[in-house]
């Protein structure tokens, strides 16, 4: 028997999500149901599903997450569980603020990667700007991958989920657009849980507003218009490539632009969120 559930649709720099409000944890979404919801032809279409649930109702204790906090139960489009999604956190925080589910503009959200502090800089029911404390952008080493028989070397970066950020020497934004981005072949010993791969332009010297461009292939999804944790990984790798340990970088993705701050102890991601639709769906 099919079940009818309420949903909303939102995106952050065109990384789009289905939002399911389930504070008491009563909606049991299977991997197959998530896949069907995210199907862009036979379903609603999205890069993933954000289930809005109280951490204490999740049934699984996450270290550092208070049971009373709102928890972002995030699923990739293929139905797999994901530890973290930076763009998803922005949309999640926007949803909470727009529906008066929090009483302050600064609050903490639980994720499978741990607690994430957010600041809602502005919000109405349609649009918001949110800053997320993403935690340390931890470098895990150097690795390589193959994309369409072309080798790319990059920096492994852990943001609660794994990334391989490949800064490509001499790559221009125009040339980046023309790369035939497809599923990467990567070192499974280095990335046993799979990996998100970013192709990144170099950070130019002498800019008042340092910027990079990137494209991303997301684990469990494919190429997306944006990836929040991926922009942080890309900024970390681009700064390191330019001989810098810290800095603020504007990251341009196909879906727009975000601001990433890399600090000694943590990183931040600031960017827009938009809620575009609400409704009900039978699955």
UniProtKB/Swiss-Prot annotation:
Example of a GO biological process term: lysine biosynthetic process via diaminopimelate
PROSITE patterns tied to this protein: DAP_EPIMERASE (PS01326)
EC number(s) stated in the UniProt entry for this protein: 5.1.1.7
Reactions mediated catalytically: (2S,6S)-2,6-diaminopimelate = meso-2,6-diaminopimelate
Keyword Protease: no
Cross-referenced InterPro entries: DAP_epimerase_AS (IPR018510), DAP_epimerase_DapF (IPR001653)
Any one GO MF annotation of this record: diaminopimelate epimerase activity
Record flagged with keyword Nucleus: no
A cellular-component GO term for this protein: cytosol
Domain of life where this protein originates: Bacteria
Biochemical pathway: Amino-acid biosynthesis; L-lysine biosynthesis via DAP pathway; DL-2,6-diaminopimelate from LL-2,6-diaminopimelate: step 1/1
Active site, UniProt feature: 85 (proton donor), 227 (proton acceptor)
Cited Pfam families: DAP_epimerase
Enzyme class: isomerase
Assigned keywords, A-Z: Amino-acid biosynthesis, Cytoplasm, Isomerase, Lysine biosynthesis
Compartments where found: Cytoplasm
Site (Could be important to modulate the pK values of the two catalytic cysteine residues): residue numbering on this chain: 163, 218
Family: Belongs to the diaminopimelate epimerase family.
Protein name, as recorded: Diaminopimelate epimerase
Name of the gene: dapF
